[in-house]
C-alpha cells in the first residue's frame, strides 16, 4: 500500500514528461468516486493501464491484465503488480481472485478491465467480451466507459505524442442485472451499448 503511493506520483511525473496527456470527462469519475465501479477502456498499447492509473491515482484500483502484460520486462511487471494488477490466466485460482474482486467492488474499490480482451489492430474497435458485465452484475456496480486515443498518424502509441483519456457517462448497475446466468439478450445489448459509446468518444 505504501509503495503504491510512492510509485504513482513518480509514474505520474514520468508519464507527463513522456506524453501530452489530456483528460476529458473527469466529472463522470466524480459520479462514482464514493462507491465501487468498473472502468472499461479501449486497448491500443501495452502501457494503457498506466494512463488510467495516473489519471485516477487518488483511488487505488484492481487491474485485470493478461499474462502478456507481465512478460514485457521485469521492471514493468513489478510496477504493474505494485499498482494492483492481477494476472488473468484462466486457472481455478483466478476464479477465487474474481470472487475476491467482486467483493472488493461491493466494498468500494475500483476495478479496471479492458473488455476487448486484446489490443486493437488497425484502429478498429473490438467488441467487448461478456466477462465485464457478469462481474458488474455480480458486484452491483456502475461501469465507466473509457477511450484512450493516441494522436499519431496510425493511432499507435509514440513517445511525446498527445494522448486523450476520455471518461464517459457511467452505465448504471441496474442495467446489468440478469435474471439468470444465460441472459444472453441482455448481455448482447450491454456489449453493443458499450461499443456504441466508445465509437462516440472521439
Question: Predicted regions span which residues?
Answer:
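Glycine-rich, highly charged phosphate/nucleotide-binding loops
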Residues: 20-24, 92-97
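Alpha-helical membrane-targeting segments
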Residues: 1-20, 71-83, 156-162
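Helix-to-loop junction immediately C-terminal to a conserved catalytic motif
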Residues: 4, 11-43
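Structural signal for hydrophobic
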Residues: 23, 79-80, 143, 167
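Non-catalytic C-terminal accessory region of glycerolipid acyltransferases
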Residues: 96-202
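A generic structural signal for well-ordered alpha-helical segments
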Residues: 14, 56, 80, 104, ...
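Short, basic, glycine/proline-bearing loop/turn elements
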Residues: 14, 82-88, 115-118
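Catalytic core of membrane glycerolipid acyltransferases/transacylases, capturing the structured
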Residues: 31-92
